[in-house]
């Protein structure tokens, strides 16, 4: 779900990074569901890293984010502000701007990951797939 339990996934990824001496990476969160239409506990979130380092023998899945046209929004805030913003994107921004979303998951690239910070503050770029 889209809740504080996401922190555990990020903590496990931190252990993976340290165990594999990965120092250069991006933290990416995939939002598979629209929280405006699906209950938060039923929404799927995937914590991801992007790195150029090749890691052998890992059981972690590897995938690529689908290409296409994405709207980008830069924001910062505290725990829960991202979900309020996502609600705004789907309920106000899309209708006001004449775009539609696609089935591709939206995602965030974190420059400060609130799930790993004691104060739960984040800085991120949020990307949502769009079409006319």
Question: What are the residue ranges of the model-derived segments?
Answer:
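A solvent-exposed interaction/effector surface
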Residues: 1-132
């Amino acid at each position: 779900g889209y809740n504080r339990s996401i922190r555990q996934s990020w903590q496990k990824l931190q252990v993976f990074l340290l165990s594999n001496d990965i120092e250069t990476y991006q933290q990416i969160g995939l939002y598979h569901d629209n929280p405006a239409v699906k209950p938060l506990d039923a929404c799927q979130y995937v914590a991801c890293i992007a790195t150029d380092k090749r890691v052998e023998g890992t059981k972690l899945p590897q995938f690529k984010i689908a290409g296409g046209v994405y709207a980008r929004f830069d924001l910062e805030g505290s725990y829960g502000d991202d979900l309020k913003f996502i609600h705004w994107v789907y309920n106000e921004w899309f209708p006001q701007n004449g775009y539609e979303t696609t089935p591709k998951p939206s995602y965030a690239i974190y420059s400060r990951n609130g799930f790993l910070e004691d104060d739960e503050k984040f800085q991120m770029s949020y990307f949502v797939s769009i079409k006319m």
